[in-house]
């Protein structure tokens, strides 16, 4: 029977005995358990591990919550029983340290681990294991099991592999846009519906930093080459690439060119499923594909790297020598260059031709892939020929049959490093056509980009599939070379599958060489050049014959001219030429042909020669979550002129406006070779030249800069080196220049459109004109669009040299560039700040603290949230879609956590307040559909907060801390983690309240630091927690028993206790109602303000861990003036200092604020109290040394020391109401808090060690790297929100955070 939800635990238990069930009763009881156990005394117990490992890295729990797996530096994995704390299994076999480990969420006894040498192992605790190695032995950064599918995600370098461990190798892989964008974390939500990825954000400084994952010699050479580039491939190509060169894999029912999922070279292909209806999306889930692959017959099993030509006998047997066509007029050099084969080539970032070695130039022709597929259409039937100039593939989905009279030479428009990898294109007239989509590794998945048109008289028509991703320059290449007669091609019963991959570096390398070879041939047919120009311009009409074409004079001249086609795309008006002298892309000026005729898509005649097997044309559509990226190109061989025609409008997310899409229909017309090939002519006027350069900078959309990047840009200096005035002046110059250019082009727009509609075909042979250039960017906008585009385009540009893409580090005010070290805000310049942080990170990592170093370093990660309900492969190459958190810090899998109910995400994000080192913020985001990505809770920490774990009920969060300090004084306990209660959403620093610290029991003789690498809650509510340290310890902490007197405070957990205001206590003078006042203060105020009435102590606070809410307490709540209690008012740093002066009036506060603003070393001495402040304001590194000295406590420290209480035996804390214990000092992100005898930079020892010495302790600069260094051994969960977690964050008396 279901009853009304009950809130009373006693009634719930009573009703459960009677057999009634209340809604939410189980959750309420579990929450009650979590609340109860936080008051209990926690005891930590070390797990006895074999071999005494030196360090423990990562922890993972089994789905039945009984086993705990831990990875260690001795290359082993130990399995421990949670209940007994005994090690029951040792997994031995990794050659290097396992960096990640995870249990399968639903299959008991299945565990996966990945180590630093690139090996992934899946262990069965009942016996046996499977292993797989990455191709280049890159470290495995993260692993994630899908909860329901037999699927393991492997993050390594810049790739995510999808592996069904029943097969030998992963069946799919997706890549980021560049090698610098490494994948550091993958994580499924509890149901497997969503996938979380963490990927490195490229930045201007990243080229100067070493990669986080070790790289071998080959990768190092590529890495250095990228660092030398003055300009990288664009992040987002100009306007209409997203329309004309990217078709979503969600295209509806493309049965003519269905694309299949990536199949690795050593993995058999799945059987082709029957074609789906044309009304459905041809998307087959990865899980279904996994299952289908099991029974699929295969003839080849090879483990060769996909990017290397395999010479084994099995692979050699699969090569198709019969594909070599008979060549009549092509010399052997060209024949070798155009040998058709099937290729597997790993995508790589773009490298200009001049930076490649001569060996690569000699051998590149054999390795260059093709991104084109040619469809031969005739009356006899249709055959898809997939040709490429690369190593042969090892197996084919079916018999290959194609009988064209001539071979087809293809050079694909280059796909950047983020392009699809191993996409399969199939074309078949029968039902065996595979309908699997390509891996969605680019910003938008690629499908067959072609519109077929059958020629009259049975002549063959060529259809080209191209795809260009929004992150790279589009490139163009050669097309088909065929006879004009009817071909003898016939229908093929087996689908021909081609792995579409492109290596831009090799492509650019060999493009010019092939151009030289091809154009130097005397027997080149007119159709060859005709197809070449069609591809170079994508939708230019084909030229009728050689009589209309000027003959090139030399191969060198041809090479120079053809280089202009590397980025020539008539469809998107992006005419660029790579200048070898300046290493820059420059615009060229073509004169486009015009004609006066009606145009149409000719859809009805496209597939006339094909049987009705569900083949449909891809309709114009839009990609989900991004700008529309699908369109169709029509390539027709009919002799007709061309004319642009509007086919629709589409929304451009980049500009936020609707823009028109044009197509061209081919009629008669010719295009001159010079008009298509020649570079931009020199302009006589300097003003025009400047305008051209400004426009070039604006329109090319230079990418994020690696290495030298923007600071070596030929036109503009690094924005970080500009003063604010110069920076905004350049912005204004750019805006004015662009506005003027747009105004001029808008005036010419209608004129050129009219001229193009009335000019004859003979005008095509005229030379380029200025008007032709002006058509490049604005042809796709009408006058209204153009006026609306001006504001957003300029608004997105933070500096002229950055083009239309704005690095996000310039978007926020605190990240604006500054000139010099000091600025009016008192913050350092970006370059200085980055350099100092790198030095600090190097110093920290030299001390063995790589976790802290990774937080100090400038590298940040973006968290993206992918819908995996349909097993769609994530488009990780697109850095702008599904971004949940733009910048965060990731050290290992423990640096990010998803709650058990899948509703919360906890991660560390960099703070906007820069310092040395940068402080960080623990942020908890919502994963609920109604407020996805909304930041709910925040807390400031220093760079040594490296591990985060949400409690089983999602109401508490534990932060693991690293430390690199040496303990100067003996200590029996060391604070290694903090537990916070998620209290009030959107409450800023008050949204989380610290409830207790996790203390590590230390031997008395141990003086070295103790750091946590991973800390996790045990899966059951109230069961406890576990953590691993850098000493190799695995500790399980459990709540043992309630502390004495805690029940008295259980009913006082209401919000009224936590919101005690100083005004309500202003009349409570110490001594008026001594006993009552003492009790209330013990409950809500004493520890909150750092006041110890009987144990005066000297506290030193250097900002470094948690910034406090700006809150002042009344001085009368913390000042002891009774002579019988010397040193009764030892205030804590934090708001205690700020409230000290509350009784003295606002003048004291104003004075402190003024002195802190001035910076430098400042001392303020007043009657009965003194505050010493050290402020290095220019560097944002304020160190506060604060102590209060009572009049009668200045004679010595004996009396105070005699009254110290004995330490609690608990590993977490003692009873808060005991007056002998120290108040907790939670430190601000740059805070280090000591008690006098214990200068451990990490936390303070037991209260017994405290002293009432009034002498301040000097704080070294190095102390500001550890977050919370707590001296607290008490439970402070009952304190007001301004409790110990904020103790040290106030800037002393000023009441302001001193981290500015």
UniProtKB/Swiss-Prot annotation:
Gene Ontology MF terms in the entry: GTPase binding; protein phosphatase activator activity; protein phosphatase binding; ubiquitin protein ligase binding; ubiquitin-like ligase-substrate adaptor activity
InterPro entries, A to Z: AMBRA1_autophagy, WD40/YVTN_repeat-like_dom_sf, WD40_repeat_CS, WD40_repeat_dom_sf, WD40_rpt
Modified residues (Asymmetric dimethylarginine): 748
Pathway per the UniProt entry: Protein modification; protein ubiquitination
Subcellular location: Endoplasmic reticulum; Cytoplasm, Cytoskeleton; Cytoplasmic vesicle, Autophagosome; Mitochondrion
Mod. after translation: Phosphorylation at Ser-52 by MTOR inhibits its ability to regulate autophagy and mediate ubiquitination of ULK1. Phosphorylation by ULK1 in response to autophagy induction abolishes interaction with DYNLL1 and DYNLL2, releasing AMBRA1 from the cytoskeletal docking site to induce autophagosome nucleation. Phosphorylation by MTOR inhibits interaction with PPP2CA and subsequent dephosphorylation of MYC. Phosphorylation at Ser-1044 by CHUK/IKKA promotes its interaction with ATG8 family proteins GABARAP and MAP1LC3B and its mitophagic activity.
A GO BP annotation: positive regulation of mitophagy
Sequence ranges of Acidic residues compositional bias: 773-782
Effect of substituting residue 36 to R: Does not affect ubiquitination by RNF2
Intervals of motif TQT motif 1: 1105-1107
Modified residues (Phosphoserine): 52, 329, 395, 444, 636, 640, 1044, 1206
Segments of this protein annotated with the region Disordered: 254-285, 344-406, 458-495, 539-562, 591-691, 748-797, 1061-1080, 1113-1145, 1191-1300
Tissue-wise expression: Expressed throughout the brain, including midbrain and striatum.
Region of interest: Interaction with DDB1: 1-22
Record field: compositional bias (Gly residues): 1133-1145
Biased composition (Polar residues): 254-266, 355-386, 458-468, 552-562, 591-607, 662-675, 1192-1214, 1230-1241
Linked residues for Glycyl lysine isopeptide (Lys-Gly) (interchain with G-Cter in ubiquitin): 45
Residue numbers covered by motif LIR: 1044-1053
Function: Substrate-recognition component of a DCX (DDB1-CUL4-X-box) E3 ubiquitin-protein ligase complex involved in cell cycle control and autophagy. The DCX(AMBRA1) complex specifically mediates the polyubiquitination of target proteins such as BECN1, CCND1, CCND2, CCND3, ELOC and ULK1. Acts as an upstream master regulator of the transition from G1 to S cell phase: AMBRA1 specifically recognizes and binds phosphorylated cyclin-D (CCND1, CCND2 and CCND3), leading to cyclin-D ubiquitination by the DCX(AMBRA1) complex and subsequent degradation.
PANTHER family assigned to the protein according to its UniProt record, in alphabetical order: ACTIVATING MOLECULE IN BECN1-REGULATED AUTOPHAGY PROTEIN 1
Family, as annotated: Belongs to the WD repeat AMBRA1 family.
UniProt note: domains: The PxP motifs mediate interaction with the catalytic subunit of protein phosphatase 2A (PPP2CA).
Protein name per Swiss-Prot or TrEMBL: Activating molecule in BECN1-regulated autophagy protein 1
Organism: Mus musculus
């Amino acid at each position: 029977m279901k009853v009304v939800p009950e809130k009373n635990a006693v009634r719930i238990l009573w009703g459960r005995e009677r057999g009634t069930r209340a809604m939410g009763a189980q959750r309420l009881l579990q929450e009650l358990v979590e609340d109860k156990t936080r008051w209990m005394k926690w005891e930590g117990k070390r797990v006895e591990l074999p071999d005494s490992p030196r360090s423990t890295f990562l922890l993972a729990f089994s789905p039945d919550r009984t086993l705990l797996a831990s990875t260690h530096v001795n290359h082993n994995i130990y399995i421990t029983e949670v209940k007994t704390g005994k090690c029951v299994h040792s997994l031995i076999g990794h050659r290097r340290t396992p960096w990640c480990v995870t249990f399968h969420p639903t299959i008991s006894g299945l565990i996966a681990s990945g180590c630093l040498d690139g090996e992934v192992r899946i262990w069965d605790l009942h016996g046996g294991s499977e292993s797989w190695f990455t191709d280049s032995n890159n470290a495995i950064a993260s692993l994630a099991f899908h909860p329901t599918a037999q699927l393991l995600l492997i993050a390594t370098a810049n790739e995510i592999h999808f592996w069904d461990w029943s097969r030998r190798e992963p069946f799919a892989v997706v890549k980021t846009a560049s090698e610098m964008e490494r994948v550091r974390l993958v994580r499924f939500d509890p149901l497997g519906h969503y996938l979380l990825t963490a990927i490195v954000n490229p930045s201007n400084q990243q080229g100067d930093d070493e990669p986080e994952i070790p790289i071998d010699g080959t990768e190092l050479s590529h890495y250095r080459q990228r660092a030398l580039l003055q300009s990288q491939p664009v992040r987002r190509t100009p306007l209409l690439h997203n329309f004309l060169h990217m078709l979503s894999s969600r295209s509806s029912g493309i049965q003519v060119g269905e694309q299949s999922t990536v199949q690795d070279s050593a993995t058999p292909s799945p059987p082709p499923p029957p074609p789906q209806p044309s009304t459905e999306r041809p998307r087959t889930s990865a899980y279904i594909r996994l299952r289908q692959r099991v029974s699929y017959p295969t003839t080849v099993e090879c483990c060769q790297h996909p990017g290397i030509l395999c010479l084994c006998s099995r692979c050699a047997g699969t090569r198709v020598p019969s594909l070599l066509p008979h060549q009549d007029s092509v010399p052997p050099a060209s024949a070798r260059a155009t040998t058709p084969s099937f290729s597997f080539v790993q995508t790589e970032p773009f490298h200009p031709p001049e930076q490649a070695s001569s060996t690569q130039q000699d051998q590149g022709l054999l390795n260059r892939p093709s991104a084109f597929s040619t469809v031969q259409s005739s009356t006899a039937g249709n055959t898809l020929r997939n040709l490429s100039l690369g190593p042969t593939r090892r197996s084919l989905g079916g018999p290959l049959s194609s009988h064209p009279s001539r071979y087809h030479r293809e050079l694909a428009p280059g796909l950047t490093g983020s392009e699809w990898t191993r996409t399969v294109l199939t074309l078949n007239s029968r039902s065996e056509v595979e309908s699997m989509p390509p891996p969605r590794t680019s910003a938008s998945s690629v499908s067959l980009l072609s519109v077929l048109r059958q020629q009259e008289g049975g002549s063959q028509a060529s259809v080209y599939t191209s795809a260009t991703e929004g992150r790279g320059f589009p490139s163009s290449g050669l097309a088909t070379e065929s006879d004009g007669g009817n071909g003898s091609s016939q229908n093929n019963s087996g689908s021909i599958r081609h792995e579409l991959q492109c290596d831009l570096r090799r492509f650019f390398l060999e493009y010019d060489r092939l151009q030289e070879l091809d154009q130097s041939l005397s027997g080149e047919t007119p159709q060859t050049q005709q197809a070449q120009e069609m591809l170079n311009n994508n939708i230019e009409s084909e030229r009728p014959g050689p009589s209309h074409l000027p003959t090139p004079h030399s191969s060198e001249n041809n090479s120079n001219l053809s280089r202009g086609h590397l980025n020539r795309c008539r469809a998107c008006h992006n005419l660029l030429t790579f200048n070898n002298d300046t290493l820059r892309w420059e615009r060229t000026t073509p004169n486009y042909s015009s004609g006066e005729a009606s145009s149409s898509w000719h859809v009805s005649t496209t597939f006339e020669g094909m049987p009705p097997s569900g083949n449909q044309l891809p309709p114009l559509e839009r990609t989900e979550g991004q700008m529309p990226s699908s369109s169709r190109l029509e390539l027709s061989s009919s002799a007709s002129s061309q004319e642009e025609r509007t086919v629709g409008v589409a929304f451009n997310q980049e500009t936020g406006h609707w823009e028109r899409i044009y197509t061209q229909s081919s009629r008669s017309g010719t295009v001159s070779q010079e008009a298509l090939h020649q570079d931009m002519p020199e302009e006589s006027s300097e003003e025009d030249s400047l305008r051209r350069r400004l426009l070039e900078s604006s329109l090319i959309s230079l990418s994020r800069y690696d290495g030298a990047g923007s600071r070596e840009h030929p036109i503009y200096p690094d924005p970080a080196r500009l003063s604010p005035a110069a920076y905004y002046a350049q912005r204004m110059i750019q805006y004015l220049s662009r506005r003027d250019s747009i105004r001029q082009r808008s005036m010419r727009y209608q004129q050129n459109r009219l001229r193009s509609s009335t000019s004859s075909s003979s005008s095509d042979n005229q030379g380029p004109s200025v008007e032709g250039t002006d058509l490049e960017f604005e042809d796709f906008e009408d006058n209204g669009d153009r006026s609306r585009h001006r504001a957003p385009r300029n608004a997105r540009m933070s500096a002229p040299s950055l083009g239309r893409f704005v690095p996000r580090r310039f978007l926020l005010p605190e990240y604006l560039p500054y000139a010099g070290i000091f600025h009016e805000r008192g913050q350092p310049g970006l370059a200085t700040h980055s350099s100092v942080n790198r030095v600090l990170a190097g110093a920290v990592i030299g001390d063995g603290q790589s976790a802290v170093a990774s937080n100090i370093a400038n590298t940040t990660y973006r968290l993206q949230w992918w819908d995996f309900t349909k097993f769609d492969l994530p488009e990780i190459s697109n850095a702008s879609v599904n971004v949940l958190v733009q910048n965060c810090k990731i050290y290992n899998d423990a640096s990010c956590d998803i709650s058990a109910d899948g509703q919360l995400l906890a991660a560390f994000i960099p703070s906007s307040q820069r310092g040395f080192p940068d402080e960080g913020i623990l942020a908890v985001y919502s994963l609920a559909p109604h407020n996805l990505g909304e930041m709910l809770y925040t807390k400031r920490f220093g760079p040594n907060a490296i591990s985060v774990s949400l409690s089983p009920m999602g109401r508490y969060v534990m932060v693991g801390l690293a430390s690199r300090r040496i303990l100067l004084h003996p200590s029996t306990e060391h604070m290694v983690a903090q537990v916070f209660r998620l209290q009030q959403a959107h409450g800023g620093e008050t949204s989380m309240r610290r409830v207790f610290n996790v203390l590590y029991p230390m031997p008395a003789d141990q003086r070295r630091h103790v750091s946590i690498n991973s800390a996790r809650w045990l899966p059951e509510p109230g069961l406890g927690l576990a953590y691993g340290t850098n000493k190799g310890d695995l500790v399980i902490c459990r709540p043992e028993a309630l502390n004495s007197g805690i029940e008295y405070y259980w009913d006082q957990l209401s919000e009224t206790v936590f919101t005690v205001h100083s005004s309500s206590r202003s009349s409570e003078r110490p001594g008026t109602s001594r006993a009552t006042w003492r009790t209330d203060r013990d409950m809500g105020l004493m520890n909150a303000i750092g006041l110890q009435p009987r144990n005066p102590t000297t506290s030193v606070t250097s900002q470094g861990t948690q910034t406090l809410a700006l809150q002042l307490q009344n001085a009368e709540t913390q000042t002891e003036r009774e002579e019988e209690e010397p040193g009764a008012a030892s205030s804590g740093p934090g708001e205690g200092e700020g409230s000290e002066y509350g009784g003295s009036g606002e003048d004291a506060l104003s004075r402190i604020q003024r002195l802190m603003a001035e910076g430098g070393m400042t001392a303020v001495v007043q009657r009965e109290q003194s505050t010493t402040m050290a402020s290095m304001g220019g560097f944002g590194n304020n160190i506060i040394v604060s102590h209060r000295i009572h009049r009668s406590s200045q004679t010595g420290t004996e009396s105070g020391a005699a009254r110290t209480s004995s330490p609690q035996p608990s590993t977490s804390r003692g009873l808060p109401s005991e007056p002998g214990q120290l108040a907790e000092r939670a430190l601000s992100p740059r805070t280090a808090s000591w008690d006098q005898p214990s200068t451990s930079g990490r936390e303070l020892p037991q209260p017994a060690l405290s002293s009432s010495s009034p002498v301040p302790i000097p704080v070294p600069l190095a102390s500001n790297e550890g977050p919370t260094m707590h001296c607290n051994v008490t439970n402070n969960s009952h304190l007001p929100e301004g409790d110990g977690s904020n103790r040290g964050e106030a800037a002393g008396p000023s009441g302001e955070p001193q981290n500015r």
